[in-house]
Swiss-Prot record:
The gene is Slc5a3. It is a multi-pass membrane protein. It comes from Mus musculus (Mouse). It catalyses: myo-inositol(out) + 2 Na(+)(out) = myo-inositol(in) + 2 Na(+)(in); scyllo-inositol(out) + 2 Na(+)(out) = scyllo-inositol(in) + 2 Na(+)(in). This is Sodium/myo-inositol cotransporter. Electrogenic Na(+)-coupled sugar symporter that actively transports myo-inositol and its stereoisomer scyllo-inositol across the plasma membrane, with a Na(+) to sugar coupling ratio of 2:1. Maintains myo-inositol concentration gradient that defines cell volume and fluid balance during osmotic stress, in particular in the fetoplacental unit and central nervous system. Forms coregulatory complexes with voltage-gated K(+) ion channels, allosterically altering ion selectivity, voltage dependence and gating kinetics of the channel. The modification Phosphoserine is found at S594, S632. The chain crosses the membrane at residues 10-29, 39-57, 87-110, 124-144, 158-183, 187-205, 304-324, 354-376, 407-430, 444-462, 511-532, 696-716.
Length: 718
């Protein structure tokens, strides 16, 4: 009989969640959620340790413990290639992309594309694509993997488990912004690594060491005769029950069905650039660093941590197949259905089955708590990032006059919509990719993200790339990828004991080769159209490319009337005159004279003085508010007129508490913004500075982590 959580395990789970909730409420109480950097970027105060841990946990959620271990059980070392590839791409993020994002003064990735190319077409395209990917590769997979853990530990129905997860996540979602997320991620990273290392050691000891794992894995085949007798099955054509001959190699032959090395290098790697260098959930955390040194340090730390999943997740998945060969390597769809409820295969239960069997009471509960809490942290981040992108980059373009409260309501309705679609998509995930969930994620992403990677790389490394080229190249790649994705869902892979009658261009062309074609076709079309159309303006490439990221800013650069985030000297002085609490001396010691010396380019945010008769307010562009002043990572910052402020003050204590708890209430902008913004700008101006000593240390770390990543590729591929 399979083990289930006992009273001690449940107590550990309850204590863990209480601790996480306390951290969330503490962060909600202490942090300022009403400003850009307060809620969205954690005040730009995070250190490299906290961000590095958060990057690791944001990526290695329960879906990785399910998916990586499951693919390890099904096909061996191959899936570890994604982890070592991520190790290298994280450094591309820290050394190339993040300095440009900081210099550009952007907060969302669609916003960067809009600033780099101008217009809104590409911004809306990327926002819509990001939302599709969040629903079909992140939310639905997270819900399924977390529910599978609950199903394995408590024996509950899969969909009951999904509903429970959503309810628990709703409790954590309101607790305090990016500060709370990063703090809880740090705790989860520590416990996750300790728990996973403990399970690895226990399972290794049981098997007899790493070399014994490799030997016994190649012999881990189910006892077909015993299974037919036990489950009363007919002796039909059995699925592939023996381990693959090349299971102990990572990068494999060009015709391999898992990881063909040309497809991985030329197609999968560019596709992964989207996730590690242009995905809102990942980039948002690194932008919270107090300076560029901490940002680079966080990617180094996360890179070193990415060495672990191969050993603490993939290898235990292989051990699970050794120990539970008759269940993990089910012999036909009927057998698989009886074992795990999926006709496509049972490799996804490899890790939870190992946890529930080998881990002692107490530690078992801690492992389950960490897995589910990490999942809910992922869901929280995805909900906030997705609602922010939809509200700022899509809805606000459609309805520019929308109030802050309207934006807030729309964001929450959109989150509910995403949850419904994600739950409806779970059955598709269960059956895709022969039950290997991680490969499902990669397949869907590889059909949609290579064009995005091509656009970001060209935008950063090629100044001549313009809006027309990027738009038509991106749309061509998207249409081709979407057609291939629709065909993949239309011509579903048959069950393993049935003949494959799909068209040759579906079954014989690996999705990584499709990704390769999409990436290079997009790049080629973008280059050709860009060369045939006018080049981008100097203002568009001044701070948004790799070659210009260290150039000085000129005074005329911010003279554009349509610049949405400018703050003029006149605004500063008049706001300080009209404020009751702001003196003529800035908190960092700068006087008005020194403020006059600031170049307009150095200031990203608008100070608005919404008072009658104030000439500054007459500037009045509805789009002049910064995105997160209007809607900060899913939380609205109310910036109404003084009349609305007075009305709010007269409301009951109950409603005041509700406003505070949900992050709806903020201080008057006219009373707080000058102090806050000048502090933020002083920090931003220093973020790109590095001392020579720190630069040397970081470069040594860069060399070390990249060398280790390349060594791992070579060691596991030869």
């Amino acid at each position: 009989m399979r083990a289930v959580l006992e009273a001690a395990d449940i107590a550990v789970v309850a204590l863990y969640f209480i601790l996480v909730m306390c951290i969330g409420f503490f962060a909600m109480w202490k942090s300022n959620r009403s400003t850009v950097s307060g809620y969205f970027l954690a005040g730009r105060s995070m250190t490299w340790v906290a961000i590095g841990a958060s990057l690791f946990v944001s990526n290695i959620g329960s879906e990785h413990f399910i998916g990586l271990a499951g693919s390890g059980a099904a096909s061996g070392f191959a899936v570890g290639a994604w982890e070592f590839n991520a190790l290298l791409l994280l450094q591309l993020l820290g050394w190339v992309f993040i300095p440009i994002y900081i210099r550009s003064g952007v907060y969302t990735m669609p916003e960067y594309l809009s600033k780099r190319f101008g217009g809104h077409r590409i911004q809306v395209y990327f926002a819509a694509l990001s939302l599709l990917l969040y629903i079909f590769t992140k939310l639905s997979v997270d819900l399924y993997s977390g529910a599978l853990f609950i199903q394995e530990s408590l024996g509950w129905n899969l969909y009951v488990s999904v509903i429970l997860l959503i309810g628990m996540t709703a409790l954590l979602t309101v607790t305090g912004g990016l500060v709370a997320v990063i703090y809880t991620d740090t705790l989860q990273a520590l416990l996750m690594i300790i728990g996973a290392l403990t399970l690895m050691v226990i399972s290794m000891v049981k098997i007899g060491g790493f070399e014994e794992v490799k030997r016994r894995y190649m012999l881990a085949s189910p006892d077909v005769a015993s299974i037919l007798l036990k489950y009363n099955l007919s002796n039909t054509n059995a699925c592939m029950v023996h381990p693959k001959a090349n299971a102990l190699k990572m990068l494999r032959d060009p015709t391999d069905e898992d990881v063909p090395w040309p497809g991985f290098i030329l197609g999968q790697t560019p596709a992964s650039v989207w996730y590690w260098c242009a995905d809102q959930v990942i980039v948002q955390r690194v932008l919270a660093a107090k300076n560029i040194a901490h940002a680079k340090g966080s990617t180094l730390m996360a890179g070193f941590l990415k060495l672990l999943p191969m050993f603490i997740i993939v290898v235990p998945g292989m051990i699970s197949r050794i120990v539970f060969a008759d269940e993990i390597a089910c012999i036909n769809p009927e057998h698989c259905m009886q074992v795990c409820g999926s006709r496509a295969g049972c490799s996804n239960i490899a890790y939870p089955r190992l946890v529930m069997t080998l881990v002692p009471v107490g530690l078992r509960g801690l492992m389950m708590a960490v897995m589910i809490a990490a999942l809910m942290s992922d869901l929280d981040s995805i909900f906030n990032s997705a609602s922010t992108i939809f509200t700022l980059d899509v809805y606000k373009l459609i309805r520019k006059s929308a109030s802050s409260r309207e934006l807030m309501i729309v964001g929450r309705i959109f989150v509910a919509f995403m949850v419904v679609i994600s739950i409806a998509w779970v059955p598709i995930i269960v059956e895709m990719q022969g039950g290997q969930m991680y490969l499902y994620i990669q397949e869907v992403a590889d059909y949609l993200t290579p064009p995005v990677a091509a656009l970001f790389l060209l935008a950063i490394f090629w100044k001549r790339c313009n809006e027309q080229g990027a738009f038509y190249g991106g749309m061509a790649g998207f249409v081709l990828g979407a057609v291939r994705l629709i065909l993949a869902f239309t011509y579903r892979a048959p069950e393993c004991d049935q003949p494959d009658n799909r068209p040759g261009f579906i079954k014989d062309i690996h999705y990584m080769y499709v990704a390769t074609a999409l990436f290079w076709i997009t790049g080629l079309i973008t280059v050709i159209v860009s060369l045939l159309t006018p080049p981008p303006t100097k203002d568009q490439i001044r701070t948004t490319t790799f070659w210009s990221k260290k150039t000085l800013v000129t005074k005329e650069s911010c003279s554009q009337k349509d610049e949405p985030y400018k703050m003029q000297e006149k605004s500063i002085l008049q706001c300080s005159e009209n404020s009751e609490v702001i003196s003529h001396t800035i908190p960092n010691g700068k006087s008005e004279d020194s403020i006059k010396g600031l170049q307009p380019e150095d200031v990203n945010l608008l100070v608005t003085c919404r008072e009658e008769g104030n000439p500054v307010a007459s500037m009045g562009h509805s789009e002049a508010e910064t995105p997160v002043d209007a809607y900060s990572n899913g939380q609205a910052a109310l910036m109404g007129e003084r009349e609305r402020e007075k009305e709010t003050e007269n409301r009951s204590r109950y409603w005041k508490f509700i406003d505070w708890f949900c992050g709806f209430k903020s201080k008057s902008l006219s009373k707080r913004s000058l102090r806050d913004l000048m502090d933020e700008e002083a920090v931003c101006l220093q973020m790109l500075e590095e001392t020579p000593q720190v630069k040397v240390i970081l470069n040594i770390g860069l060399f070390a982590v990249c060398s280790l990543g390349i060594f791992m590729f070579v060691y596991f591929s030869l």
